[in-house]
Amino acid sequence: MSWELLVKQKFSAAHFLENYKGKCEKMHGHTFELEVHLRASELDNSGISIDFGLVKEYLRGLVPDHKVLNEAYGFSPSAENLARHFFHQVSEKYPVVKVVVWESEDAGAAYAEGQ
């Protein structure tokens, strides 16, 4: 028996895609949404597995709100690269199944390992 928990955190940031030809090679911004899927195999005596509030607090400390992502990171901040980056960061503290980074309500990238 297991549960998959979902926690989301929004942040606003600017970026541009390096080595890309098209409109996204220019600086632009998004209200990103970081969606983290966590695995839990048991519940505590209160009926929960992982406290959503603690996860949200942790995610707020990770996201570079109102920053230029190209300056914040040493890689081209595509949705794909951001999803992989956040997967590894969150995995240091929580049992991550997958991470999705949404650039808009209908465009995003997911990253998972071992699948």
Question: Where are the model-predicted features located?
Answer:
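Charge-rich, low-complexity N-terminal segments
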Residues: 1-115
